[in-house]
Amino acid sequence: MITTSMTRTSALDTDMLGMVPMVIEQSGRGERAYDIYSRLLKERIIFLVGPVNDQMANLIVAQLLFLESENPDKDISLYINSPGGSVSAGMAIYDTMQFIKPNVSTLCTGLAASMGAFLLAAGEKGKRFSLPNSRIMIHQPLGGAQGQASDIEIQAREILYLRERLNAILAERTGKSVEEIAKDTDRDNFMSADAAVTYGMIDKVLATRA
């Protein structure tokens, strides 16, 4: 069995997502209630909050595809506050971001760590942002393997492949060399929002709305 992830313990409890505020809209046909995330989806805003897992990836991918079908020429905003998580789930989101026609703008609100940071950098260049006090962290994939020696060897090769693939993509997104990325992700590498701009993870720090 192989478990490959890019994650860190988060103060965010995804169970809290069950406590979602409702908003009421008035129209000529009366009142309509939305949960706040559905209402913001109408404004083409998607939230990636909490660990990146298969369930989260399916929701994000579905929302990206839906918004593309609604208007393929209008930007989508992806707000990220995540400690990271599954590499395969994160790559599903990444590939969909690159696949769809609309540009995807990313914004870090709080924490973008590990796979969360990878997805932050995956936004359209020139449209990757962070709030001033957010933190960004990059590191190499974490893996846990068990079983007989030959199985562990196979799993180790897969983790090394994923590390090389992630490093290559991050190098392209940041303008760094693969060697620099490999060195800088050898251990947890935390950055301030301003440092993330310098590194090439994001393009601008937003203190207020323009």
UniProtKB/Swiss-Prot annotation:
It catalyses: Hydrolysis of proteins to small peptides in the presence of ATP and magnesium. alpha-casein is the usual test substrate. In the absence of ATP, only oligopeptides shorter than five residues are hydrolyzed (such as succinyl-Leu-Tyr-|-NHMec, and Leu-Tyr-Leu-|-Tyr-Trp, in which cleavage of the -Tyr-|-Leu- and -Tyr-|-Trp bonds also occurs). The active site is at S114 (nucleophile), H139. InterPro entries: ClpP, ClpP/crotonase-like_dom_sf, ClpP/TepA, ClpP_His_AS. It is an enzyme of class 3 (hydrolase). It is found in: Cytoplasm. GO terms for biological process: protein quality control for misfolded or incompletely synthesized proteins. GO terms for molecular function: ATP-dependent peptidase activity; ATPase binding; serine-type endopeptidase activity. Keywords: Cytoplasm, Hydrolase, Protease, Serine protease. SUPFAM superfamilies: ClpP/crotonase (SSF52096). The keyword Cytoplasm applies. Its EC number is 3.4.21.92. GO terms for cellular component: cytoplasm; endopeptidase Clp complex. The keyword DNA-binding does not apply. It holds the Pfam family CLP_protease. Belongs to the peptidase S14 family. Fourteen ClpP subunits assemble into 2 heptameric rings which stack back to back to give a disk-like structure with a central cavity, resembling the structure of eukaryotic proteasomes. Cleaves peptides in various proteins in a process that requires ATP hydrolysis. Has a chymotrypsin-like activity. Plays a major role in the degradation of misfolded proteins. This is ATP-dependent Clp protease proteolytic subunit. It comes from Janthinobacterium sp. (strain Marseille). The gene is clpP.
